[in-house]
């Protein structure tokens, strides 16, 4: 199967070779399948990659939070508490760090999967797989992928699999931005 005269499997092999992540997204299963188009292939790669991520555990990081709450949590912002007269209402302005999966790495994946779910080119069975995986991303917010600064993302040995998956996501986002087709 080809996409604008390029065999789809060749695209997969080029990506896998470039990122040396071929084993982590279950190459043998993908090799034997036929894909009608590039988005169907990417949906399968993301489904496999996200399944692998879930087994490893989704990336978590500390995110700074600022809340007005009834009990002290983290650091008290005394100036805001006084200025807003929060103490009269038994409330405190607090700043703290939260260890969460709601970070840019997971937000990119969730938002890209939503793009794939809206594509007519993706087979129903693959959409079903992606929907099941989305249950694990309930705490993760969707973001506008057009605003992502892809080159500023940093990867280490603990989140290296994200680099391969994010390149797939970036390709999907860019192809949708510059697509001349409807949808």
Question: What name fits each language-model region?
Answer:
Residues 183:
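Catalytic core segments in nucleotide and nucleic-acid processing enzymes
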Residues 1-155, 160-179:
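Terminal, charged accessory segments of proteins
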């Amino acid at each position: 199967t080809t996409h604008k005269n390029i065999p789809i499997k060749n695209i997969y092999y080029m990506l896998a070779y470039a990122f040396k992540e071929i084993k982590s997204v279950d190459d043998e299963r993908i090799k034997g399948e036929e894909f009608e188009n590039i988005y169907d292939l990417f949906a399968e790669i993301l489904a496999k990659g996200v399944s692998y991520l879930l087994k490893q555990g989704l990336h978590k990081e500390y995110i700074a939070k600022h809340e007005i709450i009834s009990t002290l949590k983290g650091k008290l912002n005394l100036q805001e508490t006084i200025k807003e007269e929060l103490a009269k209402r038994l409330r405190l302005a607090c700043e703290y760090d939260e260890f969460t999966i709601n970070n840019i790495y997971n937000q990119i994946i969730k938002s890209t999967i939503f793009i794939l779910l809206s594509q007519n080119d993706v087979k129903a069975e693959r959409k079903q797989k992606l929907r099941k995986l989305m249950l694990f991303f309930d705490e993760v917010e969707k973001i506008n992928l057009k605003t992502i600064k892809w080159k500023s993302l940093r990867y280490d040995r603990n989140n290296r699999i994200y680099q391969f998956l994010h390149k797939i996501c970036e390709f999907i986002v860019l192809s949708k931005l510059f697509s001349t087709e409807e949808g």
